[in-house]
Every structure is written in structure tokens, then in C-alpha cells.
Amino acid sequence: MTIISERLQYLRLTHGYTQTDLARTMGVSRRAVYAWEHDKYPEIPHLIRLAQFYQVSTDYLLGLTE
């Protein structure tokens, strides 16, 4: 698991969302959310939207800051 995957899964779980909930919010499939949390990086527009949704920086999601 990558740092991005770990942080995305952590944020989703601590906010109480299922993968399906997040997929609906982001306008993507549940499979996309699963992939982000396991082996695939989100595309830049999705990364930015995820950061805004969770109110964290993209640097945090990328593992550049704590």
C-alpha cells in the first residue's frame, strides 16, 4: 500500500464513509475508490477534489507533509 492509499483509506474511515458513499460524492465508481486505496493513484483532478472534500492539502495526500 502506498502512502496515498493509506491516507485515503484512513480519511474515508475516520469520516465514516463507505467506498460507495465516497464514490457517489466524487462521481466515480466504487471500483475507482477501491483502486485508489490499493494500487492506483487518483488522477490529478480527483486528487484535488479529495483534498478539498477532506479539507487536507494535496501535499498531505501525497505524503509530502504530515
Predicted regions and their residues:
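Short basic helix-loop element that most often maps to the first helix and adjoining turn
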Residues: E6-T25, R49
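Short, charged recognition helix plus adjacent turn
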Residues: T14, R31, L62-E66
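Recognition helix of helix-turn-helix/homeodomain-like DNA-binding domains
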Residues: G27-P42
